[in-house]
Amino acid sequence: MKFRTLLIIFSLVFLLEIVSASEPQCGRDAGGALCHGNLCCSHWGFCGTTAIYCDVDQGCQSQCWSSPPPPSPPPPPPSPPPPSPPPPSPPPPSPPPPSPPPPSPPPPSPPPPSPPPPGGPERPDHRCGRALGNPPCNPGRCCSIHNWCGSTAAYCRGSSCQYQCWNSLLSALISNGNNAISKIISKSVFDEMFKHMKDCPSKGFYSYDAFIIATTSFPHFGTTGDITTRKRELAAFFAQTSLATTGQRFDSQDLYVWGYCHINETTNGNDNDYCTSAHWPCPSGKKYNSRGAVQLTHNYNYGLAGEALGLDLINNPDLVATDPVISFKTAIWFWMAQHDNKLSCHDILINANSGYVIGNIIKNSGYQNGLITNTISTMRGIGYYKRYCDMLGVSYGDNLDSWYDQTHFSEVARM
């Protein structure tokens, strides 16, 4: 029963409207246009409300955050009392001086600093850098040369980064043996799995390093259960994302070596902006069509993924297609997250022996008709899965083919 689940995952993911960037909106490159709704115009000509848009130190062009007013000067000291008139001669005896007032109580202690954000030691204002004593950013985030913590290439890559950078993070993960994923799959195996990714349209956008760095944001991905379960989860994830990004070279003798060939698979000739949820208002000119390792689609998926990852993907959807780490993070997020209150792909896979009735999960998922009509795509997903299991040295699991044997005896036919 365990790996009937895997087939469901491939079908669910394929039928999910799985979840390409625009001209500047404001500022000097947009003819001096201002942002609507009092939003700030960033150095790069986009509208937003966070420090990267509004802080003049970050290059804000218009409608920026105002500098705080200087503190009010202290009130002037009271005027000294007028001098006492000279006493008559002979002066009367002076009265005894009044008792000195009691000492003022000490000032109250300053309040304690605000606690750091949940999950890490990062400052509440997300500032970092040498001028502040090199405070750490949260795990998976980097300190940029502009003294802000963040998780994109603008913060983490090369000369843009001060510390906790991608290169140093990757070296530490592998050399210290602290990352369970790198123990299961090496760079040489990954490159052999996706042997054509450098001569496909993606031109090497996807990489082992980007994948390993992305996994650090998901501590339960590929690390749950015994080694067999963990290898199968990686094989299933790679099969899912390979099917989404396949080069579709079905005239080839080897159909299953063409994963990670596309970044924006559905953008050519597609005018749909996929702004389908009013809960996530779409800025003018932004499109939410398929991007990245899981071909993320629809504004609500960009919104939810960005919320989970601490990124503004509604205003910057092209990060999924231009930053390989973010591309993999959105794919792993999609794998790990629940959708429509259904079990996540991760949960279904690791609980396949926990008594779940897989057929009921499929029937309740809302994708039954698509599942039946896309048997061929699911079979291709199985082909990818088998190849990756072989390369990771793990068995496929039981009952793998009984769901899609294309006969009236299959589980799908009985649904």
From Swiss-Prot:
Residues 1-21 form the signal peptide. Keywords: Chitin-binding, Disulfide bond, Glycoprotein, Plant defense, Repeat, Secreted, Signal. Residues 67-121 have a biased composition (Pro residues). SMART domains: ChtBD1 (SM00270). PROSITE patterns: CHIT_BIND_I_1 (PS00026), CHIT_BIND_I_2 (PS50941), CHITINASE_19_1 (PS00773), CHITINASE_19_2 (PS00774). The keyword Signal applies. Residues 23-66, 125-167 form the Chitin-binding type-1 domain. GO terms for cellular component: extracellular region. Glycosylated. It is found in: Secreted. Disulfide bonds join 26-41, 35-47, 40-54, 60-64, 128-143, 137-149, 142-156, 161-165. CDD domains: chitinase_GH19, ChtBD1, ChtBD1_GH19_hevein. Residues 65-127 are annotated as: Disordered. GO terms for molecular function: chitin binding. The keyword Secreted applies. GO terms for biological process: cell wall macromolecule catabolic process; defense response to fungus; defense response to insect. Glycans are attached at residue 264. On the 2D-gel the determined MW of this protein is: 56 kDa. Chitin-binding protein which slows larval growth when consumed by the lepidopteran species S.ricini and M.brassica, but not when consumed by the mulberry specialist B.mori. Lacks chitinase activity. This is Mulatexin. It comes from Morus alba (White mulberry).
